[in-house]
């Protein structure tokens, strides 16, 4: 894995991430005009970065945030649809793969249910090869219907890719799920705003380290009249070190080459920091020295995860016992979310 050149090789996947300025749009026509702008950017980037195999745009980059619910429902897209047709044509022309945001994608029961927050991975032939729906929307603000699974797709030069979105990335479980399914590159598209800049930079680096995987983050920049977005799109190596990171500038681009062979060699041969292997071979040195086998312990020692899988309702009740029972809070109501008349007070 390396940074600083504009090339790539048979062993390296050239990945670019974009600090796309958050648009403020209201109509389908405006959305399609913006999609064409993104398509033109892709074709220009390929001229400057001839090794680019994959380009990643942030969450909300195509449609912006529709703060008006009627506009959100009216502009909700189908997949495939007009927006993806524009992106597919650009990927074919530029001979590159791309990750694009659709906020939102129409629910199967549209317009009776809220849309999904969706990413698509499109290959260099213009085919949609992965569609991921955000599993953990940013409540209480985001009103998206949650998705229910992650995916892994063989990407350019055989690199295995998973997609996650923004607030998903605050939960270590989703990173681990992608990595344990075989993901070598986890792409996190986000429309993250201040104040949580340092936390998000730290989270991406920590999850690359913890999951022995590459991470590509594309984040929005600018101000949309409601939120200010901090950019810092970045590409991170599987050892948790940043290869390249934008600042807060609008339309900043970072680029790095991610080696396919290096990550596979590390996962096969690293020992003390091979977190994926060691999690399912716990204590193998001591177990071997004790004459109890050569594989360590595979059983899950974490009661929370066992409860969640076997009895999700019980797990929910357990977390409510230490937090609260309603989704809203009386001291800072948001929208029409329900809340009790009084929350726990400090020390209660």
Curated annotation (Swiss-Prot):
Disulfide bonds: none annotated. The active site is at residues 59, 134, 166. Its EC number is 3.5.1.4. It is an enzyme of class 3 (hydrolase). The keyword Hydrolase applies. One of its GO terms (molecular function) is amidase activity. The keyword NADP does not apply. Residues 13-260 form the CN hydrolase domain. CDD domains: aliphatic_amidase. It catalyses: a monocarboxylic acid amide + H2O = a monocarboxylate + NH4(+). PROSITE patterns: CN_HYDROLASE. Keywords: Hydrolase. Catalyzes the hydrolysis of short-chain aliphatic amides to their corresponding organic acids with release of ammonia. Belongs to the carbon-nitrogen hydrolase superfamily. Aliphatic amidase family. NCBIfam families: PRK13286.1. This is Aliphatic amidase. The gene is amiE.
